[in-house]
Regions:
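ABC ATPase NBD coupling module
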Residues: 75-77, 88-104, 127, 133
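Short helical segment in ABC ATPase nucleotide-binding domains corresponding to the A-loop/adjacent helical element
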Residues: 67, 118-126, 137, 141
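ABC-family P-loop ATPase nucleotide-binding domain
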Residues: 1-27
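Conserved catalytic motifs of ABC-family nucleotide-binding domains
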Residues: 73-74, 110-119
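Conserved ABC ATPase "signature" region
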Residues: 81-88, 133-150
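Short beta-strand immediately N-terminal to the Walker A/P-loop
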Residues: 49-50, 105
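The feature captures the beta-strand-to-loop junction immediately N-terminal to the Walker
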Residues: 52-55
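Conserved structural motif at the start of ABC-family nucleotide-binding domains
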Residues: 21, 36-38
């Protein structure tokens, strides 16, 4: 058995955490209703973080805030900071489409938009300015083939 000298002082230092995201004083409003109230949180890089809570407590609202999915909700307002590599993703000069290449979402249950399969597949491309029908048709066909649905 190892014997310790309890009179000897041992200083243990831990390395700084490398953060994937840092949340500072995050508030989310739907009109006058405050859905998220001042969250401060850090997500460590290469670690799994679980958000647990009862239905309606704001988990989905919080997650949607991380990559600005709440931007599509007219009455939603987000304040505070969501820092990715030191940059606030809520800044007005952020290219949302480029940012979402780095901060993606994979939900437990697929939740397509209330549109056709074709429109769900072409949605992001159309938002980026792709308008050519032949190009969009090719994107849909390729996507469905890759998913084994063509």
């Amino acid at each position: 058995m190892t014997k310790y000298n309890w009179d000897e002082r041992h200083i243990i230092t831990f390395p700084e955490k490398e953060l994937a995201l840092e949340i500072k004083d995050l508030h989310v409003y739907y009109g006058q209703k405050e859905a998220i109230k001042g969250i401060d949180m850090q997500f460590e890089k290469n670690k799994i973080t679980a958000l647990i809570g009862p239905s309606g407590c704001g988990k989905s609202t919080f997650l949607r805030s991380l990559n600005r999915m709440n931007d599509t909700i007219d009455i939603a307002k987000v304040t505070g900071q969501i820092l990715y590599q030191g940059v606030d993703v809520n800044a007005s000069n952020i290219n949302v489409y480029e940012m979402r290449k780095h901060i993606g979402m994979v939900f437990q249950r697929p939740n397509p938009f209330a549109k056709s399969i074709y429109r769900n597949i072409t949605f992001a491309h159309e938002r980026k300015g792709v308008r050519d029908k032949q190009t969009l048709d090719e994107i849909v066909e390729t996507s469905l083939k890759q998913a084994g649905l063509w």
